[in-house]
Design a protein with these regions (language model features):
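N-terminal pre-Walker A segment at the start of P-loop NTPase domains
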Residues: 1-16, 135-139
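Hydrophobic anchor at the beta1->P-loop junction of P-loop NTPases
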Residues: 27
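Conserved glycine(s) of the Walker
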Residues: 33-35
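Post-Walker A alpha-helix
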Residues: 38-40
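Post-Walker A helix-loop "phosphate-sensing" segment adjacent to the P-loop in P-loop NTPases
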Residues: 44-55
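Conserved P-loop NTPase "ATPase switch" module shared by AAA+ and STAND
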Residues: 67-94
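Structural recognition of the conserved hydrophobic beta-strand(s) that form the central parallel beta-sheet
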Residues: 83-84, 105-114
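Acidic, divalent-metal-binding catalytic cores of TOPRIM
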Residues: 88-89, 122-322
Length: 322
C-alpha cells in the first residue's frame, strides 16, 4: 500500500478529518480527547453500515483490528487502513511488529505508550483536538496535530554533536565537526541516545542530536522532554542521512526530485518497514557504478570533496549551524 489517504469519519455530532501517508500512524494524548470515540465509530459503521448513522469517506477500506483472533484477521486483510486501540495488548508484541512489517496495510494505532518494536516516524505522531463547529452545523470538528514540533529552532552553534549510529552519516558529520573544532560522538544506536544524554546532564555546552526521524518515534517522548527540560539539547531529525543527500540535489536527477516531492506515492509499505530503508536503496541504486557510489556502512570519501560536502551542508544549514 502506498500514497496519501484522506479519512473522514462523521455522524451528526462529530466530524473527524485527517490524512495519513505512512504505514504506521500513532495517535497519542490524554483521556477525553476523542481517540476511543473514533475507533468506536469505525467499528459501529463496520457492524451496522448506514444504519449506524455514521459516514466514512476514504479511498481505502477502514477497519478495526481487535480481539483474540487478531493474527488471523490481520493475515487476511490487504489494502486496508487498520485502526487499533491501546487496550489491545498485542500491539506490544514482537509478533505484531513482524506482521505489520509484512503487511500491505496502513496502521493507525491509538496508544499513550511508546511501541519500541515498531519503527515509526516522529512526523506521524499526532494528538486530536476539537477545532470548533463544522461549517455552521452542530458537529464538533476533530483534527490531528503533531505532538512534537517539526521545526525546532536549531540556530545555536553546537559545541558537541551526537549522531545516532556509526554508519556513513556519522563519518560525514565527524569529518565536518573536526573541521569546525566540534566534538562528534556516536550513540551506537537510537535506543542508546537517551542514556548518553543522561551522562551529559551536568554539562552546559550546546549539544545537537542527529538521528533518523523516519524511525525514532518510540524514543521521541524521552528525548523531547529532556531537550525541553535542559534547554541546551537540540534535536535535528531528518528522515535519514540518505534523505539529506538525495534532497540536496547533489545528484542531478529528475526522478529523484519527483520522488522527494511526494515520497508517499513511491514507497510501498509492504516492501519498506520504514522510509529510511527506501531512501537508502534509492541512493544506492542511483549512485551504483558512479564516483558517488554509496554504501551505508562506510562513507565514500568523494562525499567529503569540497563541492560535494558543501552541497550537502547547504541543504541542512537552515536546520543546524555547522
Amino acid at each position: 500500500m502506498k500514497g496519501k489517504h484522506k479519512i473522514v469519519v462523521k455522524n451528526n455530532r462529530l466530524h473527524y478529518e485527517f490524512e495519513i501517508k505512512r504505514n504506521i500512524t500513532i495517535i497519542k494524548g490524554d483521556s477525553a480527547t476523542g481517540k476511543t470515540t473514533l475507533i468506536n465509530m469505525i467499528r459501529q459503521f463496520a457492524n451496522l453500515g448506514n444504519a449506524s448513522g455514521i459516514e466514512i469517506e476514504c479511498d481505502a477500506p477502514c477497519t478495526v483490528l481487535e480481539g483474540n483472533m487478531w493474527q488471523m484477521l490481520l493475515k487476511n486483510l490487504s489494502g486496508n487502513i487498520i485502526f487499533i486501540d491501546e487496550e489491545n495488548q498485542f500491539i506490544r508484541q514482537q509478533e505484531f511488529a513482524e506482521l505489520v512489517k509484512a503487511s500491505d496495510n496502513y496502521f493507525v494505532i491509538i496508544t499513550r505508550e511508546n511501541l519500541y518494536n515498531l519503527p515509526y516516524s516522529v512526523e506521524e505522531i499526532y494528538g486530536l483536538y476539537s477545532s470548533g463547529k463544522y461549517q455552521n452545523t452542530k458537529q464538533i470538528y476533530q483534527e490531528m496535530y503533531h505532538i512534537y514540533p517539526l521545526n525546532q529552532d536549531l540556530s545555536c552553534k553546537p559545541e558537541k554533536i551526537i549522531v545516532e549510529d556509526t554508519n556513513s552519516g556519522y563519518e560525514y558529520f565527524k569529518a565536518i565537526s573536526k573541521e569546525k573544532n566540534i566534538v562528534c560522538e556516536s550513540a551506537g544506536g537510537k535506543t542508546k541516545i537517551f542514556a548518553m544524554l543522561e551522562q551529559l546532564k551536568a554539562e552546559t555546552e550546546s549539544i545537537c542530536v542527529i538521528a533518523d526521524g523516519a524511525a525514532i518515534g518510540p524514543e521521541m517522548d524521552a528525548l523531547y522532554k529532556m531537550s525541553v527540560e535542559k534547554g541546551n539539547i537540540k534535536l535535528y531529525l531528518p528522515e535519514s542521512f540518505e534523505w539529506i543527500i538525495l534532497s540536496s540535489e547533489l545528484l542531478e536527477d529528475k526522478e529523484i526530485k519527483d520522488i522527494m516531492d511526494k515520497p508517499e506515492n513511491y514507497i510501498e509499505s509492504q516492501e519498506y518497514f520504514s522510509w529510511e530503508r527506501f531512501y537508502t536503496k534509492l541512493l544506492v541504486d542511483k549512485t551504483a557504478g558512479t564516483y558517488l557510489k554509496y554504501q551505508k556502512g562506510k562513507l565514500n570519501p568523494t562525499y567529503l570533496h569540497e563541492k560535494n560536502k558543501n552541497k550537502i551542508l547547504n541543504n541542512i544549514k537552515n536546520s543546524i549551524d555547522l
